Amino acid sequence: MSASDLTSVQAAAPQGSRQILVTSALPYANGQIHIGHLVEYIQTDIWVRTLRMHGHEVYYIGADDTHGTPIMLRAEKEGLTPKQLIDRVWTEHKRDFDSFGVSFDNFYTTDSEENRVLSENIYLALQEAGLIAEREIEQAYDPVKEMFLPDRFIKGECPKCHAKDQYGDSCEVCGSTYLPTELLNPYSVVSGATPVRKTSKHYFFRLSDPRCESFLREWVSGLAQPEATNKMREWLGDAGESKLADWDISRDAPYFGFEIPGAPGKYFYVWLDAPVGYYASFKNLCERNGIDFDAWIRPGSKAEQYHFIGKDILYFHTLFWPAMLEFSGHRTPTNVFAHGFLTVDGAKMSKSRGTFITAQSYIDTGLNPEWLRYYFAAKLNATMEDIDLNLDDFQARVNSDLVGKYVNIASRAAGFLIKRFDGRVQDSAMNHPLVAKLRDAIAQIAASYEAREYGRALRHTMELADEVNAYVDGAKPWDLAKDPANAVALHETCSVSLEAFRLLSLALKPVMPRVAEAVEAFFGIAPLAWADAAKPLSSAQPIKAYQHLMTRVDAKQIEALLAANRDSLQAEAAGAAAAGANAAKDAKSNAKAKPAAVNGADDAPISIDDFAKIDLRIAKIVACQAVEGSDKLLQLTLDVGEEKTRNVFSGIKSAYQPEQLVGKLTVMVANLAPRKMKFGLSEGMVLAASATDEKAEPGLYILEPHSGAKPGMRVK
């Protein structure tokens, strides 16, 4: 039996109370929560609520990820200490999670004494096991800020295609990867200074040790997701290949984080202490509530431990984290569940289009957070597939499913029951075949939730809602109410409808807990659990007056949401411009900090003759596929009106799924000299637009001509 099959069986027929620790990835404490983040927290929260409704002992743990160079520099930019920054962001994050009903048992911070002690103890245990190595490495160093620079804090000219303002490890124009030392005209993003090379002692976790490889090969066999297992096997390679590399776990001062014991001026890399933050947050909860922390995290513990993450951090959670735990004397995760990314209207979230939607803007615009919980759940399954928030579909699905199908059932029956029957159901109606069918379906729906097949659970629920509405339409209680002789039939119809509504509310409770709470108050019943499927409404407990449970989504609300996030971008741009002006003044006053002209002569006008040298052609994308081994590249097969198609590698993977591009027309540079790349020969370049500051305004957009253009046409 597979791990996913076992999960389904446990959901349908829980054998006693289980002890379960659940985490979501820790949000980084230098920005706002947006709807892309919420996919994961909503997914985890639904699973946690499902388990709680079985009566299991479940703890859902979270924290802000608070250490690292970006935090330190962001705080400096805002005139704050790092501690002041992370305290403010923690308050904002906690507010957003509360708004969306994310039910953490503890939401903490990695900048805590518990995390420092646990991180040190894990490090010292790994050191004792002979799994920590010391090495001298050469790095880029900012002579003005007197700090070593991570690759992403260096920019310059791509050594391959000569695009300007590219990061120190890869080019987002041509997709090439390279060493920071190969970058042309490099400069520090922090100060503008030209980096120098300096050596420094660093500390490494010896993941290449045969003990780690042997352990991970065994551990990977228990992963529930085939995609994760395949990726792990790709990273591990075949037996004897030794593909695992040692992991640099240290950073040099100045750095906001925990100093490594016995290594003054050296700090734990944020990715070492961040996952330890799961345990630190749980330990904080345990100490406040008298829970035996060690019983949950020691080897051989009967407690279960699950991590929900995005697929982009699978590497850290399925290689480093379990190996760190195994060789430091802790239990290892029971499983890791990864999800895909979120697109909005089929494209990467964009600040310029207003689709980079923050959690707070959603709330401020007046949208119901349970609408989004429902929509995401309807799209989620147990795989790593990306999901799309189509705003038109969002409006239509919420209005149809939740208002038209679900809420409508109660509103059609409650008034008659209160007016004609003192709010009391007909007990004999609780045995109606339709009620029995819904009651029997609850175990299947609960099993789908625990198997993380939320879309399947909700499809099943809405199919049942359709049957209930068909029953009401056929019985026509509004007609029955016209004749007192139909009182018994009317009573039965209303009673069946409301018991069906109770069962549908039970099925929807993990997704829409606030609506479920209102339903519980309406019926005057205790909080619903899965076992309550067998406890129908009773004439002994009259229902309360019906209160409207949910409004429809208005298109104007969606328009206001997009506008609010576009306005937010404009405010950011104004602030960035002011900051940029100040930075320019600072750079001017310090000549040695001035980079070699990044733009300089390149900004000078060119002649029409220069432009005429570039052969721009319309190209049709006839095939497109991801490039295995590259996080940035797509391989395009282009029809440019020649006898043969062209093969082009383009660094646009972050913005498009391959299937989105097939059949589209675009513009390519047709006379660019072919370039041999690691993955094959690239015979040109497709053109894409992006903002100057891609961090402030992320997004890549290929150029598309108007209809009528044909492959091979010149762009003049």
From Swiss-Prot:
GO cellular component: cytosol
Cofactor note: Binds 1 zinc ion per subunit.
GO annotation, biological process: methionyl-tRNA aminoacylation
GO molecular function annotation: ATP binding; metal ion binding; methionine-tRNA ligase activity; tRNA binding
UniProt binding sites for ATP: K351
Motif interval(s): 'KMSKS' region: 348-352
Residues that, per the record, bind Zn(2+): C158, C161, C171, C174
Quaternary structure note: Homodimer.
Protein name: Methionine--tRNA ligase
Organism: Burkholderia orbicola (strain MC0-3)
Lineage of origin: Bacteria, Pseudomonadati, Pseudomonadota, Betaproteobacteria, Burkholderiales
Record gene name: metG
